[in-house]
Amino acid sequence: MLPAQEYMRIWQGGENTRVPLTEVTYASDGASFTADGVTYKTSQVDSITFVHIITVTWDGTQATVEKGNVLDVDTSVSAGDVVINSTNTHNELEFVLQGACSDGSLTYTGSYKCKFYLNGLNLTSQKGAALEILCGKRIDLILNAGTENVLADASGGEQKAALYCKGHLEVEGSGSLTVTGNARHGICTKEYLQLKRSTGSITVNSAPSDGIHVGQYFLMNGGTVTVSGQKGDGIQTEILTLDDDITPNPDKEYNGQIFIHGGSIDVTVSGDDKKGVKSADKMTISGGTVKVTASGAGSKGISVGKHLLINEDNATTLVEIRATGGVYEDDVTDDETKCTGIKVTQNMAITAGTLRVANTGSGSRGIKVDGVYYVGLGTTVSAKFTKGSVKTDTIPPMD
């Protein structure tokens, strides 16, 4: 990708073709145009949008920004720290981030959807987040094929994560991303986090709090996610609320939920009362591999705030949980909680797939379901349900 280029997207039937503006010529009567050697009839084109590419390159201690003549975008650079403010509300911006810097960062503020391509980026901040996207719209994060990308934030500061997105973060691309959290979370999104089928690998290797912390919901269709070294939970969702900080926001769909439809998750969590995967609401595993190793008093492999459904949609499902630990007693409330492989607050249904849960430690439990649970024919389940869990012969309500 060349820096600071303008492109045209030609939309037909929901699909689009992107061509450089320099490769577009128009017929004198306006009935057609030729883009990159292909002629289009104007009447057969659904719409046309324009894209401007901005390239940010870090080289040692200095960053440079190539933005050409793009309008409504202000940039400032101080050594390796880059701040970009956009008031653009009509053309989609695309940013290519590349190079290496041990004292650098990027903070982007805008109010329109945009894309960030990580093209071999190795960025460590000494002041705050490495990559902070302050835009509440849809943000596409593309891990360019064949690239390794590394982000780490400062050990101090008020940043929420090494990689923080205020909006809806959708990840794709077959490259890799390794994140080190030094202040709070490794990766944090205020709205949903979605990993598309084409996603490569994402690794969070440490964080003082959660490895991956997500508002609204977490949706995984592909990719490989590895989380370890965090002192909080491995992957956690939260329910977005209204201004009273109590009432769930009714406008946020799938609020607090986790969906695993494909890919591979491997989470290691260690510490008292910590969870490998924690869903604030319902959780659905319908494909892929989920492996969690949890150790510590009161630790949980998977903790679900409402219902848990395990089935198979378009891919095989394998869930393996290992939980080791005893009973945790809260110093303030004196409440006790036991180490548990899977803890479900409401109902649980296993209609397809393979589930293995192993638990060790005094008072530890395999699976604890506060509602009722169902195990369908043809499933492979190797786990012990606690005596308080009630089995049913029909699939229980999962709404």
Q: Language-model segments: which ranges?
A:
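Structured surface patches comprising rigid loops and adjacent beta-strands/short helices at the edges
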Residues: 20-30, 38-51
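A composition-driven surface/loop motif
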Residues: 52-399
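C-terminal trimerization/auto-chaperone modules of long, extracellular attachment fibers and adhesins
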Residues: 9-18
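Boundary of Sec targeting at the N-terminus
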Residues: 4-5
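Residue-level detector of beta-strand face positions
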Residues: 9, 32-34
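Glycine-centered tight beta-turn/hairpin loop motif at sheet-sheet or coil-to-beta transitions
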Residues: 14, 35-37
